């Protein structure tokens, strides 16, 4: 099974205040922030602060000892954030074009996971609302998610689809996570020594 979680960054510039934003969206963002599901922007004018997003992300990776195998993103308004990741991390970054030809397969994969019950999630109001607000639309190329109404928020669903752009191949033999070289590069020193002694490494055949 797959498991998904989200963390949203909440701007309030257009609404005028976070209180107005909560009333407009019908979501108690202060309560959800206390539960760890979102961060209300600290920007004095209510704009998203890329530095705040960047620091949160790196802290999350470090605090949870994550080995990032793929970072897919919508290139729109992400240049500063991605440049910081490129300069300071070795994460594999990939811009994903937000068009049907690119998104139809991960969209179908995610839809199938939910239908078959092969995905779990935390009881998180932001993700729940995004999933409810998202609808599948089809054209002559394939399927893609869209908003039920223009004012609805589905950013979390868009992010999940971007993540599954590569993740849907994770258990295939050709996936990067199944590449022996990649495995060694992402092992601890102890794990590397164990791997070198393992017949499956193929290195023992040379001696």
Task: Name each model-derived stretch.
Residues 1-98, 108, 125-207:
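RNase H-like, metal-dependent nuclease domains and their acidic two-metal-ion catalytic environment used
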Residues 95-122:
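Short alpha-helix plus adjacent loop in nuclease-associated cores
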């Amino acid at each position: 099974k797959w498991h998904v979680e989200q963390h949203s960054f909440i701007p309030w510039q257009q609404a005028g205040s976070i209180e107005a934003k909560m009333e407009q969206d019908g979501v108690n963002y202060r309560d959800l922030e206390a539960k760890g599901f979102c961060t209300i922007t600290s920007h004095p004018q209510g704009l998203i602060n890329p530095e705040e997003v960047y620091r949160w992300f790196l802290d999350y990776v470090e605090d949870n000892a994550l080995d990032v195998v793929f970072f897919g993103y919508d290139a729109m308004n992400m240049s500063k954030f991605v440049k910081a990741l490129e300069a300071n991390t070795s994460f594999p970054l990939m811009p994903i074009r937000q068009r049907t030809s690119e998104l139809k397969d991960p969209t179908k994969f995610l839809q199938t996971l939910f239908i078959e019950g092969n995905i779990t999630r935390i009881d998180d109001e932001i993700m729940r609302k995004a999933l409810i607000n998202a609808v599948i639309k089809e054209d002559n190329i394939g399927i893609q998610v869209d908003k039920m109404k223009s004012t609805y928020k589905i950013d979390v669903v868009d992010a999940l689809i971007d993540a599954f752009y590569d993740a849907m191949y994770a258990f295939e033999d050709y996936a990067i996570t199944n590449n022996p070289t990649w495995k060694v590069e992402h092992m601890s020193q102890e794990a590397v020594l164990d791997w070198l002694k393992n017949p499956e490494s193929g290195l023992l055949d040379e001696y």
